[in-house]
């Protein structure tokens, strides 16, 4: 993953950030609060793990900015920054306290940057096979629509909750996340280097469907908060570190 970088210092730095991210995320889970709670992981370790990924993403950009992978790295770095803002909004660390709609908007903007990065990558590298690209996109959009219907809309109705504005805002958001997964899958079908990118995008959608169920439909189970983060955190990491595979692709 790191062999396409120019110097050992760059490799060690990005590997080190990966280790710190894993220690914050998984260490926060292992050494967190009481196991009976909905979440063991403390808020500070969750926010810090996302902040480390922002640093990693901009480090990738700094190391690749003079290569054809630089544009992709910058778009991913900006997308990850909006992801961190979304985390802070949902955790209540921004002025005004917890703001679900602001969090959704931040994540949605982040994914628009991810989508733009993938579209530009596909155009630049010739990974534009129509069946792979549009077929994967169509399938994932259907998955996103079905997930929103079952988890958010039907889930709310089943619990006697009248769907409100935020439930309907969740629909285009789910479709944006599904589009990210679809485009990533399209890339992976044409170049196996991007399988981990596709996995990351799929995990992000899964994590957000669980989160939507918790917030909008009253879904609950033991350690649900940790399940959300143990899918979301690796999802963001795989998207950020996909820059390595882009660099390998353009340097071949």
Where are the language model's segments positioned?
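Polytopic alpha-helical membrane-helix bundles and their juxtamembrane interface segments
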Residues: 1-252
